[in-house]
Amino acid sequence: MKWSEISIHTTEEAVEAVSHILHEAGASGVAIEDPAELTKEREQQYGEIYALNPDEYPAEGVLIKAYFPQTDSLHETIAGVKSSIDVLPSYDIEIGTGNITVNEVNEEDWATAWKKYYHPVQISDTFTIVPTWEEYTPSSPEEKIIELDPGMAFGTGTHPTTTMCIRALEKTVQPGNTIIDVGTGSGVLSIAAAKLGASSVQAYDLDPVAVESAEMNVRLNKTDDIVSVGQNSLLEGIEGPVDLIVANLLAEIILLFPEDAARVVKSGGLFITSGIIAAKEKVISEALEKAGFTIEEVLRMEDWVAIIARNA
């Protein structure tokens, strides 16, 4: 089978939104070439367990590559993707050039090329994220491994927002806690919470592909006795109370449910949010405070923030 590689040149701010647009358009896989990976702070702190080739990354901006089977409707699909991306500035998301290029790739190249972007990464004092196809031996008994197979559909679990969420969970999760993960994606945050001692984790995503991916990764990490995965829109119809909610979503989506989060998380419980570009920190903090939360801590990495807030 022939595949088309759709490359979109954009900004780091727009990565999650553009990736979501591509998934919704039916991409069978997405790879992200971000030059920030070459100089990330965590390389000094923890050390990525591989060497990156600068020649494979754009000089500026971010290149997002998505893979679609070649069909008669591909041109319409690309036009729809472009239209959706062009709308993002109306949500204050800078898209950069937004240039789109198309290349043909063979199935055998498509099936393996994306794996070069994904290697074991130690993202905190506790966790190392390891792809299923690589062998890795923990450096200490305390080191916890999260195995992920993104299935060509979701990220590697090493984006700054995911890293900060996991570090926030390390700071806050207590043995026996009950947790909800909103917009679970690959399920990485739910798996981390389970490995930190949570007794029950409910993981939700609106995207059925995400639900399938999360279920697979939860089983892979042998946390399916703790983590349940389901399809749901944010916190609609979800009852509490739970000890903690974690949501790694775009700021614009987080703004849709602070009141629901305050309803579902118990009094004194925590709401961890990320996916927030630094410029949106103030508006998110104000929305959380309006819903009754107190901001306890803000984590920062590159141009992103994560917020730990406590319910009244």
Curated annotation (Swiss-Prot):
<feature type="binding site">
    <location>
        <position position="205"/>
    </location>
    <ligand>
        <name>S-adenosyl-L-methionine</name>
    </ligand>
</feature>
<keyword id="KW-0963">Cytoplasm</keyword>
<dbReference type="GO" id="GO:0032259">
    <property type="term" value="P:methylation"/>
</dbReference>
<dbReference type="InterPro" id="IPR050078">
    <property type="entry name" value="Ribosomal_L11_MeTrfase_PrmA"/>
</dbReference>
<feature type="binding site">
    <location>
        <position position="248"/>
    </location>
    <ligand>
        <name>S-adenosyl-L-methionine</name>
    </ligand>
</feature>
<dbReference type="GO" id="GO:0005737">
    <property type="term" value="C:cytoplasm"/>
</dbReference>
<dbReference type="InterPro" id="IPR029063">
    <property type="entry name" value="SAM-dependent_MTases_sf"/>
</dbReference>
<keyword id="KW-0949">S-adenosyl-L-methionine</keyword>
<dbReference type="InterPro" id="IPR004498">
    <property type="entry name" value="Ribosomal_PrmA_MeTrfase"/>
</dbReference>
<feature type="binding site">
    <location>
        <position position="183"/>
    </location>
    <ligand>
        <name>S-adenosyl-L-methionine</name>
    </ligand>
</feature>
<comment type="function">
    <text>Methylates ribosomal protein L11.</text>
</comment>
<protein>
    <recommendedName>
        <fullName>Ribosomal protein L11 methyltransferase</fullName>
        <ecNumber>2.1.1.-</ecNumber>
    </recommendedName>
</protein>
<comment type="similarity">
    <text>Belongs to the methyltransferase superfamily. PrmA family.</text>
</comment>
<dbReference type="GO" id="GO:0016279">
    <property type="term" value="F:protein-lysine N-methyltransferase activity"/>
</dbReference>
<keyword id="KW-0808">Transferase</keyword>
<dbReference type="Pfam" id="PF06325">
    <property type="entry name" value="PrmA"/>
</dbReference>
<keyword id="KW-0489">Methyltransferase</keyword>
<feature type="binding site">
    <location>
        <position position="162"/>
    </location>
    <ligand>
        <name>S-adenosyl-L-methionine</name>
    </ligand>
</feature>
